[in-house]
């Protein structure tokens, strides 16, 4: 009897310890988020007091005069991420559809391995590749052609004009697109693979083409997962540092076209934080706080979109 009582006590104690330990690990996530946010606010407080809301709108970044504004890094971050998504999403969609619907079995695994290898390449390698391969190629061959043919067209001069530097927003966005394609394509492939085969077979049995099955069966059934994959790619694009630092140009000048050198929040921090002090360091911390807020807003927006889609699907 005593042995059973002791065994029951040990099981109860172990169960209680297990629950409390796992709860502590879960709570650790919130503690880390709060610690990061608090440290960013404390570090940027001097800049917040000095510049207030004007920090978000001013274009200057002058360490000598101690005048700082964040609009150029913010624009650089958003523009490069937008270019990357504009290029990466349709390509990733095509890769995922090919792997799940069209590719023969012997070809699926090699392509999947290649995608995983692309995702595993360090970002600094992408940056070096972009700097030594893409930048000269764009400067000498691609940008001059685009400027000559599109730079004078009404409505397009804002995008394809200026001097062909090679480095700049467009090159950075293109390399960033190559970097996020493996992540988006992998998630889309997994999402498409969970579509019930009966739905697709029924559509094919009614005479639907592959395009019609994709448009009318696969996409409606997986649109929630598609939004999640795009938001994953956007989060990856917003926070990229090393590759962008190599090829964006690192210029605190308001861009007048997609070919203009610029900077992003992450690249500005990486370039200047090591030698910064005083107000400049606080301004860089505020840039980090802004990036934290932007990524959080993207996450919240994605959750709201997914919730909305789930509610619509349930009706």
From Swiss-Prot:
Q: How does it sit in the membrane?
A: Multi-pass membrane protein
Q: Which Pfam families match?
A: BPD_transp_1
The cellular component terms of Gene Ontology attached to this UniProt record, alphabetical and capped at eight, are: plasma membrane
GO biological process: any one?
phosphate ion transmembrane transport
**Where does the chain cross the membrane?**
23-43, 78-98, 118-138, 165-185, 224-244, 282-302
The stretches that face the Periplasmic side, renumbered to this chain, are 44-77, 139-164, 245-281
Q: Give residue ranges on the Cytoplasmic side.
A: 1-22, 99-117, 186-223, 303-315
* Span of domain ABC transmembrane type-1: 74-302
Report if keyword Transport is assigned: yes
Tell me the compartments it is located in: Cell inner membrane
UniProt keyword annotations, A-Z: Cell inner membrane, Cell membrane, Membrane, Phosphate transport, Transmembrane, Transmembrane helix, Transport
Q: Which InterPro entries match?
A: MetI-like, MetI-like_sf, Phosphate_PstC, Phosphate_Transport_Permease
Q: Which GO terms describe its molecular function?
A: phosphate transmembrane transporter activity
Q: Which domain of life is it from?
A: Bacteria
Q: What does this protein do?
A: Part of the binding-protein-dependent transport system for phosphate; probably responsible for the translocation of the substrate across the membrane.
Q: What is this protein called?
A: Phosphate transport system permease protein PstC
At the highest ranks, the source species' classification is:
Bacteria, Pseudomonadati, Pseudomonadota, Gammaproteobacteria, Pasteurellales
């Amino acid at each position: 009897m005593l042995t059973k009582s002791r065994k029951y006590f040990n099981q109860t104690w172990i169960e209680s310890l297990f629950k409390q330990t796992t709860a502590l690990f879960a709570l650790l996530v919130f503690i880390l988020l709060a610690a990061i946010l608090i440290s960013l606010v404390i570090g940027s407080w001097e800049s917040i007091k000095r510049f207030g809301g004007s920090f978000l709108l001013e274009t200057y970044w002058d360490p000598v005069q101690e005048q700082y504004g964040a609009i150029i890094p913010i624009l650089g971050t958003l523009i490069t991420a937008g270019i990357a998504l504009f290029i990466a999403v349709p390509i990733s969609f095509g890769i995922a559809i090919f792997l799940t619907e069209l590719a023969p079995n012997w070809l699926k695994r090699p392509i999947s391995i290649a995608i995983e290898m692309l995702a595993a390449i360090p970002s600094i390698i992408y940056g070096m590749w972009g700097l030594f391969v893409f930048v000269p190629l764009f400067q000498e061959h691609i940008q001059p052609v685009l400027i000559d043919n599109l730079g004078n067209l009404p409505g397009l001069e804002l995008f394809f004009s200026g001097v062909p530097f090679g480095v700049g927003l467009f090159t950075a966005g293109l390399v960033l697109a190559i970097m996020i394609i493996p992540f988006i394509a992998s998630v889309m492939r997994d999402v498409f693979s969970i579509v019930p085969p009966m739905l697709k077979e029924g559509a094919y049995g009614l005479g639907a083409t592959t395009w019609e099955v994709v448009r009318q069966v696969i996409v409606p059934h997986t649109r929630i997962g598609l939004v999640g994959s795009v938001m994953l790619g956007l989060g990856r694009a917003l926070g990229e540092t090393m590759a962008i630092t190599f090829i964006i140009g690192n210029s605190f000048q308001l861009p007048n076209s997609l070919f203009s050198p610029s900077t992003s929040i992450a690249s500005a921090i990486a370039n200047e934080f090591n030698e910064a002090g005083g107000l400049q360091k606080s301004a860089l911390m505020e840039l980090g706080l802004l990036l934290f807020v932007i990524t959080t807003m993207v996450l919240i927006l994605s959750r709201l979109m997914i919730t909305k889609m789930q509610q619509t699907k349930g009706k």
